Amino acid sequence: MGMYLVSVCAEDWFTEGEDGWGDAATALNGELRLRGLPPYESVPAEADFVRGSGQTFEEKLIPSMNGFWDLCQAHLSREDAETVCGWTLLVPFSLDGTITLPVDSGYSDSTVVVGAPQLLPMAQRLAAAVELPPETPQMCDNLDLTTWFRDGAAKELATARPGPWGDDLDTAFYVALFLRAAEHSIRRGCPMAYC
């Protein structure tokens, strides 16, 4: 099985219990109200799967994140590095910092929420630092990044056109993953979560 980063549709966002994100949605809306912000209710419905359409997002986290963490520490402030690596729920709107919810995220006892508009410039800085190539898949409907990095296309490109990104493909994978996740969340107006 492993760990995946996926887009969350309205049906899953509003479903309570283990099968959905309703507990986190309710807790988040409570925190937003405390901050004088409107509730987050405009989550898009599940889209039909069409490869390359950019309507869904699913990637598998396979490689080690050690090199990615080192890259974050080298190019971001400590706070930004922790933001990039520490969230468990990404939302498509701006937040003034992270929000920690007392809701099990599936991987920890709490859910750490970050706004994609805050994550995106951090991911863009990392992409610039490694010179992520334009051939990196833009849409991540069904393991497109995972396949590109794991099945040889990235390695072939790194051999043909060397660059900092090709020196550590595992690190480049995570740079691309977080960049594309933030872009997808903003473009589709949907949350992103690990499952």
What are the residue ranges of the model-derived segments?
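Acidic (Asp/Glu-rich) sequence patches and key acidic residues
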Residues: 1-184, 188-195
